[in-house]
Amino acid sequence: MMSPLVIKLGGVLLESDNAMMRLFKALLDYQKSNKRHILIIHGGGRLIDDLMNKLSLPIEKKNGLRITQSEHINVITGALAGTANKILLSWALKYKINAVGLCLADGKSVNVEKLDQDLGHVGKAKPGSPLFLTKLCEQGILPIISSIGITDDGLLMNVNADLAATALATTLKANLILLSDISSILDGKGQRISEINYLQAKKLISQGIITNGMIVKVNAALEAARVLQRSIDIASWQNTDQLKLLFNGINIGTRVLV
């Protein structure tokens, strides 16, 4: 059997019925003819931003990571582990996919500790135990996992979903796809880069071609490639037929090399 596949969802996907339809149709079609274990992990940055704005709460970021004050973590947990997670679960059920909504702490699948005092309740994700998630997958259940973690002393932590996905893939010795509305990494002329390695990526970052949140995404992919010793795909959900190719290991976006 192929290695498990972790699909990290991001961008506007959670807000787009069209995107959800394409994704879950592709997943359903793929599962009909393939026995590969698939897991979904997600963030929900835009959903959090909308909620924070409605509540007149400040949105602060440092190096692409959200600063999460102690008085805000319950709101963010509700948005990610609650609303965003259950939206995805509802789409899975709509397409008759047997799924369960989880967070990083369930089954101790991903361990989390505080990343940086200045960031507040922002967690650093580390590999955990594969047993719980493997058992679910073996029963034909699709785990849908939010990027909310819990520390050993019981503190809720908001974890960058790209970094959480890396830790999850490491836990399961899985392949990793970073799926969003961004189809690929672009060069200085706006052209797709089909493959990129560490030195090339760092050069584009130093040149200001890769910026902001994309830096976190690329660094997460580079770290995942290093830890897993396998390439990582950055791709878009836009084309259903291409998604099926992607699930079978064919590069449709940018492949981050070891």
From Swiss-Prot:
Cellular component aspect of the GO annotation = cytoplasm
Task: Give the family this protein belongs to, as stated in its UniProt record.
Answer: Belongs to the acetylglutamate kinase family. ArgB subfamily.
Q: Does the keyword ATP-binding apply?
A: yes
Q: What is this protein called?
A: Acetylglutamate kinase
**Where along the chain is substrate bound?**
44-45, 66, 158
Pathway as given in its UniProt record: Amino-acid biosynthesis; L-arginine biosynthesis; N(2)-acetyl-L-ornithine from L-glutamate: step 2/4
Per the UniProt record, the source organism is: Buchnera aphidicola subsp. Schizaphis graminum (strain Sg)
Note the Pfam families from the entry: AA_kinase
Name of the gene: argB
Which pairs of positions does the record mark as disulfide bonds? none
A single GO molecular-function term is: ATP binding
- Catalysed reactions listed for this entry: N-acetyl-L-glutamate + ATP = N-acetyl-L-glutamyl 5-phosphate + ADP
Compartments, record wording? Cytoplasm
